């Protein structure tokens, strides 16, 4: 298993309940594939550097985890098809 970090930005107009369900969904994907979450940080609503899909703000979430590539591929697939996620990036930690 390798160490990964993902930062994703959710739409700012989501209700708190919907934000929590999205965070739980991606956390569950990692754990269901046998991964371990070392850090989950909800950074809250922040201003974007530039407009994305006509939004000037977004709800930022940072997750550090250890998992195999199947978990990353599944989480990435789910983020691509979810309209609530306006931007995401996975980074493999080389440590």
From Swiss-Prot:
It comes from the Bacteria. GO terms for molecular function: small ribosomal subunit rRNA binding; structural constituent of ribosome. GO terms for biological process: translation. Keywords: Ribonucleoprotein, Ribosomal protein, RNA-binding, rRNA-binding. Coiled coil: none annotated. CDD domains: bS6. The keyword rRNA-binding applies. One of its GO terms (cellular component) is cytoplasm. Gene3D superfamilies: 3.30.70.60. InterPro entries: Ribosomal_bS6, Ribosomal_bS6_CS, Ribosomal_bS6_sf, Ribosomal_S6_plastid/chlpt, Transl_elong_EF1B/ribsomal_bS6. Binds together with bS18 to 16S ribosomal RNA. NCBIfam families: S6. Belongs to the bacterial ribosomal protein bS6 family. This is Small ribosomal subunit protein bS6. The lineage of its organism: Bacteria, Bacillati, Bacillota, Bacilli, Bacillales.
């Amino acid at each position: 298993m390798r160490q990964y970090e993902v930062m994703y930005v959710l739409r700012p107009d989501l209700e708190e309940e919907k934000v929590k369900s999205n965070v739980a969904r991606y956390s569950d994907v990692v754990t269901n594939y046998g991964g371990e979450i070392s850090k989950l940080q909800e950074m809250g609503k922040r201003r974007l550097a530039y407009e994305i899909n006509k939004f000037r703000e977004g709800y930022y979430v940072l997750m550090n985890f250890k998992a195999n590539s199947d978990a990353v591929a599944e989480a990435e697939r789910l983020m691509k098809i979810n309209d609530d996620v306006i931007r995401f990036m996975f980074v493999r930690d080389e440590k």
